Amino acid sequence: MRKNAIAYDQLYALLRPAVWHKAVLEVATGTGQVAKHLLCSADHIEATDASAAMISQAKRGNFSSKLYFSVQDMFHLPYADQSIDVVIVCNALHIVPHPEKALIEFRRVLKNDGTLIAPTFTHAENSPWGNLQALALKIAGFPLHSRWTSAAYLAFLQQNGWTVCKSVVLQNSIP
């Protein structure tokens, strides 16, 4: 798991400048770890998840007025058009059906000069270890709806109207 901790520390270091003094929406926050790690950099973070249980867990230990957790559907966000500086969706687009529809909703809430940050695990290499982990995710209730290589994921984003300004592959124990 040390490999995961290193990868996430690298991810946080990459994200902090992008959220500096910004209004941030994190979608699919899960336990809220990304939002909590970025709290000191952002002006305000709205961290959402479709699971009430995940939001309940994420709220534990949150004493900041700059961080608000709520249950939301990433396909129907309650935020005004062009009201968010940065949308973050970490490791989630591969587990939702029709991720392109989520991208449309993210574009709606982002300001014209806003930034989408969408790191995800790439599972398409089909290694035995990757396939085993994909099966474990499915059993845990997170079936993979999309299996991308890094290049295919970037192409998916571009095909859906996004300009990729930066792409970094971080080594993690989850492929």
Identify the role of each PLM range.
Residues 3-22:
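Conserved alpha-helix/loop element of class I SAM-dependent methyltransferases that forms part
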Residues 25, 31-76:
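Class I SAM-dependent methyltransferase SAM/SAH-binding core
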Residues 88:
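A conserved beta-strand element that flanks and buttresses the S-adenosyl-L-methionine
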Residues 91-92:
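Short catalytic micro-motifs in class I SAM-dependent methyltransferases
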Residues 100-112:
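A short glycine-rich, Lys/Arg-flanked "PGG" loop and its adjoining helix->strand segment in the class I
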Residues 117-140:
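Conserved class I S-adenosyl-L-methionine
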Residues 145-160:
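Short alpha-helix
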Residues 162-172:
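Conserved S-adenosyl-L-methionine
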